[in-house]
């Protein structure tokens, strides 16, 4: 498939880009080659090939879903440089 200079100019206009004649000619050829490559890839036989999201077939290790006591406010506040009434106290940043 050949991408015309007019198509490149139209897409450039939509993207609010400006190309001179030389750039338009160059991009027309480059985009045509990319479209041809995608066309060739779409013609490859893929029946029986499992879809994948990663180039390497690997399993992501997952930890067990264990319910724990999440109420550890006192433990967390013990690590804070300054705390007041059960909350972190930070320096004033807005006047």
From Swiss-Prot:
Which species is listed as the source?
A: Magnetococcus marinus (strain ATCC BAA-1437 / JCM 17883 / MC-1)
Example GO biological process: regulation of translational fidelity
Which EC main class describes this enzyme?
A: ligase
Q: Does the keyword Thylakoid apply?
A: no
The record's PANTHER family line, in alphabetical order, gives: GLUTAMYL-TRNA(GLN) AMIDOTRANSFERASE SUBUNIT C, MITOCHONDRIAL
Task: State whether keyword Nuclease applies.
Answer: no
Stored Pfam families = GatC
Q: Which domain of life is it from?
A: Bacteria
Question: What does the UniProt function comment say about this protein?
Answer: Allows the formation of correctly charged Asn-tRNA(Asn) or Gln-tRNA(Gln) through the transamidation of misacylated Asp-tRNA(Asn) or Glu-tRNA(Gln) in organisms which lack either or both of asparaginyl-tRNA or glutaminyl-tRNA synthetases. The reaction takes place in the presence of glutamine and ATP through an activated phospho-Asp-tRNA(Asn) or phospho-Glu-tRNA(Gln).
What does the record note on quaternary structure? Heterotrimer of A, B and C subunits.
Return the protein name. Answer: Aspartyl/glutamyl-tRNA(Asn/Gln) amidotransferase subunit C
GO terms for MF: asparaginyl-tRNA synthase (glutamine-hydrolyzing) activity; ATP binding; glutaminyl-tRNA synthase (glutamine-hydrolyzing) activity
Q: Which reaction does it catalyse?
A: L-glutamyl-tRNA(Gln) + L-glutamine + ATP + H2O = L-glutaminyl-tRNA(Gln) + L-glutamate + ADP + phosphate + H(+); L-aspartyl-tRNA(Asn) + L-glutamine + ATP + H2O = L-asparaginyl-tRNA(Asn) + L-glutamate + ADP + phosphate + 2 H(+)
Reported EC number(s) for this entry are 6.3.5.-
Give the SUPFAM superfamilies listed for this entry.
Glu-tRNAGln amidotransferase C subunit
- Record family assignment: Belongs to the GatC family.
Kindly state which keywords UniProt assigns to this record, in alphabetical order.
ATP-binding, Ligase, Nucleotide-binding, Protein biosynthesis
InterPro entries xrefs: Asp/Glu-ADT_sf_sub_c, GatC
